Amino acid sequence: MHLNNNERIDDLEYKDLKIIQRKDGFCFGIDSVLLSNYAKDIKRGTVGLDLGTGTGILGILLCGKTDLSKIYGIEVQQEVAEMAQRSVKLNNLENRFEIINKNIKDLESVFDKNSFDFIITNPPYKKMDTGKTNENSKKLISRHEITATLKDFIKISYIMLKDKGTLYMVHKPERLVDIIYQLRKNKIEPKEIRFVHPYEKKEPNLIPVSYTHLRAHETELH
């Protein structure tokens, strides 16, 4: 497998899956692993979208943990998308995981509306005018809402999900109000919200959440 400068192959320690990452780029964290575990109820034969796939970590893990039929990883950065595609090939997942170099806001030119059983995403957590910015452009796009905002991620999820399809997302607790507001605007109902604490007696720092498209649910809090 060809590696570019500053790239390495990391072992995911699960079913012999591996991933290519840049030493100076944005590497996956525990949030992606938690989200892939949270979405293990994805049903056999379903088709989904991974919005902002980055290195392809979520799609690769889901191919190993579920019997999904096909998942499309959408990545706006061309160099990152090309690297993710090599990771797909490295794991022999070409028939199940396809990388598309596109801004999520432009997906209506690629797919029909209401085409997907599920959508999974680990979007940028920070608004552009908040938090410490990183001079590395690739890391900056991964962490801050530069090419797409939370509103954009939820809006395109509404457009692309089938009726009763599921959206899986991980985000920060401080954005929960924004998330619920945008979901309600787009007729997506929260189904389950979990608060993840890094240590006992510490405040939660992550919230994996599942949402259902156009279907009322009693929200479960954990």
Predicted feature locations:
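Conserved beta-strand segments of alpha/beta enzyme cores
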Residues: 18, 70, 96-98, 189-192
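Mobile active-site "lid"/loop adjacent to the S-adenosyl-L-methionine
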Residues: 123-152
